[in-house]
Amino acid sequence: MVRALILDLGDVLFNWDAPASTPISRKTLGQMLHSEIWGEYERGHLTEDEAYNALAKRYSCEAKDVAHTFVLARESLRLDTKFKTFLQTLKQNANGSLRVYGMSNISKPDFEVLLGKADDWTLFDKIFPSGHVGMRKPDLAFFRYVLKDISTPVEDVVFVDDNLDNVTSARSLGMRSVLFHKKDEVQRQLTNIFGSPAERGLEYLSANKTNLQSATTTDIPIQDNFGQLLILEATEDPSLVRMEPGKRTWNFFIGSPSLTTDTFPDDLDTTSLALSIVPTSPDVVNSVIDEIISRRDKDGIVPTYFDNTRPRVDPIVCVNVLSMFAKYGREHDLPATVAWVRDVLYHRAYLGGTRYYGSAEAFLFFFTRFVRNLRPGTLKQDLHALLSERVRERLNTPVDALALSMRIQACHALGFDAPADIATLITMQDEDGGWPAAVIYKYGAGGLGITNRGVSTAFAVKAITGSPVKTETNIGGDGARAVSAMSSLEARRLQPISSVGDWVRFIIASLHVHLAWLWNVLLLSKVV
């Protein structure tokens, strides 16, 4: 596919340095440049002398003063060499798939002067000066003329101009358009449009491997396991991260805690995430699950810390615990916690964030992990339907890059796409290939936010490269019984087998699973 970039020249690639003193005042000069006389001159319908004489008559001044003022303006014209180099690199990196065109409101005499301001014009495949074409921006006819000449589908054309009227005309014809205001911002947008966002994101992660650490919103470095685990799950690349695993349970911090108490307990959030991602022996998982069950509060809700002196509860922490339980077929051991997070989802109690998390998208994203880990059945089916409804409600809501990536991933996990959100996410990519830091979680006391560009980038790459997955949410009849048996067997496999009775129950459960599987095969053969 060949794409096209159409650029304005004046005030985009070339800049004017206004002369300190001119025969014509700056106010009058501005009026001249916006007059219909100047428009006709730029279309090539008036000669230079005709235009200057008409302007002198209109604005009660001498034609020679008009001419001298524009001579001074021409002399001040300067090529932006850095922006030109950027454009050359952009075109070179496209490997022949990008054509660059100039489209400028400029008279024939002024265009001849402009050509002398640069030695090398090979950047452009063609230039369309209004004085030679007989039309000018924002005339729709001028845009249609250029589109016909370059023979590129309008959806593959990007237009850059510093004038909003011109940009509006281009957009009305279906062109993707960038209003030139700040050069750095335009360069970022063009890099995102014509580059490969995913490849650039992966390059950023690779260039910063093992240094993708967190920081507070006040730029204080934070060494934490949680952010590393999120990067690991999103990328499946252990070489990118540096963690400090716990022997059994995990701590949020790597090394000494920061900006909190001198000693900091292990927490259920980090531990559950780790046991969902990092291969761990069943005996360890089983012992942690049993301890978590024993730590439920009077409402049957799991806490945040393995420390009874810190009775904190957060619905997203609960969801992450349930996700780990579901991975091992044990979600039924926390019925009150399941019921509570379902109520949080149903009543949209997550919209204002939670104690430790700032965005609604964080709750929805982590909830999709929980639903994904559930075995097919009524619970999965009901939660999947409600969660899908809640995620759809958030589509196109303005949020930061991380929250947007979380939302897109949630959409994909639930089986539908979010093309508008993906397009927005791509525009947020920074020039270095990473995505902006955004608050992932926060300190419970005071609410100081913790960010990580590595997490933002890893999540963004996964979001834009992902696609909706087909999910099975419910199995009825004998299939449901087979799944139930398998869940029971999975749970038993996590428990120590220390007696003859345990062995007997394990063997019976295994036979139940295999017989159910055989019955399903027979049913399927009848259908086929």
Curated annotation (Swiss-Prot):
CDD domains on file: HAD_sEH-N_like
Extra information: The various drimane-type sesquiterpene esters produced by the A.calidoustus drt cluster include asperiene C, asperiene A, (6-Strobilactone-B) ester of (E,E)-6-carbonyl-7-hydroxy-2,4-octadienoic acid, ustusolate A, ustusolate C, ustusolide E, ustusoic acid A, (2'E,4'E)-6-(1'-carboxyhexa-2',4',-diene)-9-hydroxy-drim-7-ene-11,12-olide, RES-1149-2, as well as the 3 newly identified compounds calidoustene A, calidoustene B and calidoustene C.
Described function: Drimenol cyclase; part of the gene cluster that mediates the biosynthesis of various drimane-type sesquiterpene esters, compounds that exhibit diverse biological activities and are widely present in eukaryotes. The pathway begins with the synthesis of the backbone drimenol by the terpene cyclase drtB using farnesyl pyrophosphate (FPP) as substrate.
Alphabetically ordered keywords of this record: Lyase
Catalytic activity: (2E,6E)-farnesyl diphosphate + H2O = (5S,9S,10S)-drim-7-en-11-ol + diphosphate
Gene3D superfamilies: HAD superfamily/HAD-like (3.40.50.1000)
Pathway noted in the entry: Secondary metabolite biosynthesis; terpenoid biosynthesis
GO biological process: terpenoid biosynthetic process
Protein species of origin: Aspergillus calidoustus
Protein name stated in the entry: Drimenol cyclase drtB
Any one Gene Ontology molecular-function term assigned to this protein's record: lyase activity
